[in-house]
């Protein structure tokens, strides 16, 4: 697939790798297609396919991936036009990563790709004690936790797909699982609340 941009080249570098990833997920997609992409300020997604050319006009990177996903699933048609008005500036999903165990990094990446294909641009990771805290081994004990490097990796991956990663980190309360362990008395106020200094 040849991608031609009629707008700023910075978007090209951002979506080139993500486009390859999404196309690789669609087995059998090896069509010789020219893809023309233009970013605009209006909250619309426009797709126009004529034979071996697809024109996509959109506002955000995640909208581009929604349009690309639509085009991939309508490739058997010689020609089509599709238009959609984007109703929300921010639209996405919150994953609760504090119930039993955290999602693997690969599963979160899969969900990021899915959100992009749906045109969504926000992923919130709700974490109570499932993140790394230096010197506090009981955070995420026996449940898993995200390291700083994993959160950075997920943030970079999400950015490539136009998705904002928002780590919703509990820093004062809802920490029952971490504070139940011996040795946490110095920082515990009550069963699930930290003692601020």
Which residues make up each language-model segment?
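Feature activates predominantly on carbohydrate-active enzymes
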Residues: 51-197
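Contiguous, structured surface segment used for ligand recognition
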Residues: 1-88
